[in-house]
């Protein structure tokens, strides 16, 4: 059953990535790949923490979402190819900017995803000092 969920969610994630490519693709900078990777970092951090603690969704479906959807939506291989293409075309500033935005931005998006999840999970709690 796990493979079915990963496959179904993977197909949806791949279609969403393709749609983002159509919407943001083109130009000299790989903005579509950067966008899907940053969104994916946020979604993985948020959804995996929030859904695991708050919902009744089974672990099999959670893994399908994380491995399938987010895995197919994000792309390290396209990031790597895009970076090499920027370097080979002499666009060093774009290449360095892209690498920094991807890594630093990814970490920031994970932090935001976890912060939002924590905020929503702790929303109804009242602490007595």
Swiss-Prot record:
Regulation: Na(+) is not transported, but it plays an essential structural role and its presence is essential for fluoride channel function.
Superkingdom assignment: Bacteria
Gene Ontology molecular function terms on file: fluoride channel activity; metal ion binding
Keyword Transmembrane among record annotations: yes
Record's bilayer topology term: Multi-pass membrane protein
Binding site for Na(+): 71, 74
Subcellular location: Cell membrane
GO cellular component: plasma membrane
Example GO BP: cellular detoxification of fluoride
UniProt similarity note: Belongs to the fluoride channel Fluc/FEX (TC 1.A.43) family.
Keywords: Cell membrane, Ion channel, Ion transport, Membrane, Metal-binding, Sodium, Transmembrane, Transmembrane helix, Transport
Source species: Listeria monocytogenes serotype 4b (strain F2365)
Main location: membrane
HAMAP family: FluC
The protein's role, per its UniProt record: Fluoride-specific ion channel. Important for reducing fluoride concentration in the cell, thus reducing its toxicity.
Protein's name in the database: Fluoride-specific ion channel FluC 2
Catalytic activity as recorded in UniProt: fluoride(in) = fluoride(out)
Bilayer-crossing regions: 3-23, 32-52, 59-79, 90-110
